[in-house]
Amino acid sequence: MNDSITVRGKDRYKSGVMEYKKMGYWEPDYVPKDTDVIALFRVTPQDGVDPIEASAAVAGESSTATWTVVWTDRLTAAEKYRAKCYRVDPVPNSPGQYFAYIAYDLDLFENGSIANLSASIIGNVFGFKPLKALRLEDMRLPIAYVKTFQGPATGIVVERERMDKFGRPLLGATVKPKLGLSGRNYGRVVYEALKGGLDFTKDDENINSQPFMHWRERFLYCMEAVNKAQAASGEIKGTYLNVTAGTMEEMYERAEFAKQLGSVIIMIDLVIGYTAIQSMAKWARRNDMILHLHRAGHSTYTRQRNHGVSFRVIAKWMRLAGVDHIHAGTVVGKLEGDPSTTKGYYDICREDYNPANLEHGLFFDQPWASLNKLMPVASGGIHAGQMHQLLDLLGEDVVLQFGGGTIGHPMGIAAGATANRVALEAMILARNEGRDYVHEGPEILAKAAQTCTPLKAALDTWKNVSFNYESTDTPDYAPTPSVSM
């Protein structure tokens, strides 16, 4: 089945229906060029459908093919523009599923456009009837394509310089409850959290401009809180002002107002769409603003293993698009996140070059062509008692956001912030002293709590609470590569 079965010559363009694998979309001898975009799909064919034909159909329908032969193919450089499925492997331990490797000529894509890239790669093909399910698992983006994108507007290094925070993770909290607070009370939460020791607070994904608190009111009270907290602490502080709105004009207006008020950071939601994200990233670059992206909505298509788009692909696209922060999982929190898979997401965000690593779900080497690094954000169900685990699993270049773990503190918001800051500082000190902070973590925290009542209260309240559920999206790691079909 490794032989090419492409029909050549005039028979290739006879009117009628022809199998995709015979039209040139299956080329097992093809060697991808350095400039090719490569997509790895998990293909689940309908019963009785040949996996080679199903994979060739994915290549065809995501590039130049339609359901029947069209003579106008002869007016194009058809051999060049056809996507080529060159390898199909059975997925380890998943009967009926196949990994299809498909190469696309770079000329098929518009420079610097995630919208155009996604329109081809995840366009109509996901509704193709011969497939039970289809998932985009990973992509190899060539340097020639990567360099057409801006990349993160600010980047990790410059963000740390602006915030004057070095040698430790940044600390944040999402204001809770996310909906219903007045502007004045919202600002009080921001002030207490920042005064207590956090670096950032943030709006949640669905706080925009509602009857109980219009956006301008929120921005004014939040920035008043930031300025007061900076004066009280002597540290640079920030709050993610969510500028997500119904139109680009409204988002630009909100972003400009945030800038006028002196904010160092604004926020957008993934649901605004790829073009809007890139537009806001370009605005942030021009205006020296950090851009935080909340991945609201991603689990509708990233969570299931057999259908949709892997978050590792979304992370790659967002690094290209130009955001500075992205929620990337916590492992130990309340949201989906297999440890190995999550490490792969963090590698995509923070490394200059990603070598293939099947254990972390990375199928391809990925160069980043000096694009700025993207700061991953960990949030959702984390608390001070997990600090040693978070530092070990996620490293130093990360924002740890304790929403409930700050605002739910029994002694109040400022005490919750202090508990998190003291826990982090104690763990960083232990790490820098060469201690085995992972195994000694509970002991280190208990000792720090002896001189910090807020930390003791946090540890007594949440103890070792964790959300230990089996992940639905785990790497299909095989010790040896499967044999090409």
From Swiss-Prot:
The catalytic residues are: 176 (proton acceptor), 294 (proton acceptor)
Which BP terms from GO are recorded? reductive pentose-phosphate cycle
Cofactor binding note from Swiss-Prot or TrEMBL: Binds 1 Mg(2+) ion per subunit.
Q: Which residues carry this modification: N6-carboxylysine?
A: 202
Protein EC = 4.1.1.39
Q: What is the main EC category here?
A: lyase
- Reactions catalysed: 2 (2R)-3-phosphoglycerate + 2 H(+) = D-ribulose 1,5-bisphosphate + CO2 + H2O; D-ribulose 1,5-bisphosphate + O2 = 2-phosphoglycolate + (2R)-3-phosphoglycerate + 2 H(+)
- Binding-site residues, Mg(2+): 202, 204-205
Keywords of the record: Calvin cycle, Carbon dioxide fixation, Lyase, Magnesium, Metal-binding, Monooxygenase, Oxidoreductase, Photosynthesis
Molecular function as annotated in GO: magnesium ion binding; monooxygenase activity; ribulose-bisphosphate carboxylase activity
Cofactor annotation: Mg(2+)
Site (Transition state stabilizer) location in chain: 334
Q: Can you tell me which residues bind substrate?
A: 124, 174, 178, 295, 327, 379
* Subunit structure as annotated in this protein's UniProt entry: Heterohexadecamer of 8 large chains and 8 small chains.
Q: What else is known?
A: The basic functional RuBisCO is composed of a large chain homodimer in a 'head-to-tail' conformation. In form I RuBisCO this homodimer is arranged in a barrel-like tetramer with the small subunits forming a tetrameric 'cap' on each end of the 'barrel'.
Role this protein plays: RuBisCO catalyzes two reactions: the carboxylation of D-ribulose 1,5-bisphosphate, the primary event in carbon dioxide fixation, as well as the oxidative fragmentation of the pentose substrate. Both reactions occur simultaneously and in competition at the same active site.
Report the NCBIfam families cross-referenced here.
PRK04208.1 (NF003252)
Query: Record's family?
Result: Belongs to the RuBisCO large chain family. Type I subfamily.
Q: What is this protein called?
A: Ribulose bisphosphate carboxylase large chain 2
Species of origin:
Rhodopseudomonas palustris (strain BisB5)
